[in-house]
Swiss-Prot record:
Zn finger residue spans: C2H2-type: 74-97, 113-138
Organism: Drosophila melanogaster
A GO term, aspect molecular function: zinc ion binding
Name recorded for this polypeptide: Protein lethal(2)k10201
Function according to Swiss-Prot or TrEMBL: Vital for development.
Amino acid sequence: MDSEAAGVALLSREQIIRILSEVPAGFIKPTDPPAPSLAPFKKLGVLVDIDDILGEQDAAAARIRDNIDKEQSYSCVECRKMLPTAHLLDLHITEQHDCYFAASVERGDKPMFSCFLEECTIKFHTARQRKDHCIITHKLPANYRFDHSKNRGKQKHQGKSKPNSMEVDEVIEETKSLPYVKAFSFGHQTQRSFYTGKDQRSGKTLDDVQAMKEAINDILD
């Protein structure tokens, strides 16, 4: 027993006073809060303002919305044109790729051009009337490009190529109107560099020689 008591370290006076000070005095009431067993939590690290966190969340949400808008853009299957809304895509398909719509516009019996805004139900006989309506009534910009036709570039290209084709036709007509000149040469006819007439016929060699002699005699006379 004495050896076990000697091995145990004795508490100092300050330690005993500290332990006794932590013991509550008197009776403990049921309403008294229990003594905390753990130390209060202390946040260690970099402090971030709540406004910065909200700003980053808003920026991330905006990027997500932009990506969704790009993925959900409306594309025409025929010409691959991108349009921002389903209504504009419907108008594009109807006006550019629908034969019934083109025939109805040529007849002109009823208005066929719908307004660019989906909420507006007014229709017009021509695209010009619709554009004026959207600029005046709905305050759309004057350089709104939705109603441009897809064949205008082709028409311009064809218009530019027409003068060239006419010039080629004129050159062909001029060459046809030129008189036929028969090619002949003095001496042995071994080589010919150019032949402007028709195909040579093998049965008229003597006639060509006789014509050449007559031409020489005319020159000497």
